[in-house]
Amino acid sequence: MAIRVQVESFDAGAEVNAMHAANVGVGAVVSFVGYVRDFNEGREVSGMFLEHYPGMTEKALAKIAVEAEQRWPLLKLEVLHRIGALEPGEPIVFVAAASAHRQAAFDACAFVMDYLKTRAPFWKKENTSEGARWVEGRDSDHAAADRWK
């Protein structure tokens, strides 16, 4: 398992290739990359600032990853989340799960993203055409996480 919280951008393709190269038993790698949108809830977004609680955020992500590893036969799991100032089009989050078979990788990747959105202490502040605003969690994120209970 690899957990990273960082300011720097990342190359999702290189991350996936590294996961596969590290283990010849990998039959499937499923990944998700989230990007900063230029539009949200009817407002133009010119940028975003992501804050986190150092130490606590990494522990929360590790707890989610451990639960995924207990639920599915994974060979590798990576969670990478950016913080700081971001512009539309930039990657925010990368989650990838590697397994011998695709279904475990699909399920684990979805589980980690659903739990990350509801259980990891990140705060998003969007700069919009109407000023800056903190982004609230969505009911749909909680509903998605509830399916794993």
Regions found by a protein language model. Give the residues of each.
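N-terminal, polar/charged subdomain of small-to-medium soluble alpha/beta proteins
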Residues: 1-92, 106-110, 114-149
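Short glycine-rich or small-residue beta-strand-to-loop segments that form or flank ligand, phosphate
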Residues: 92-99
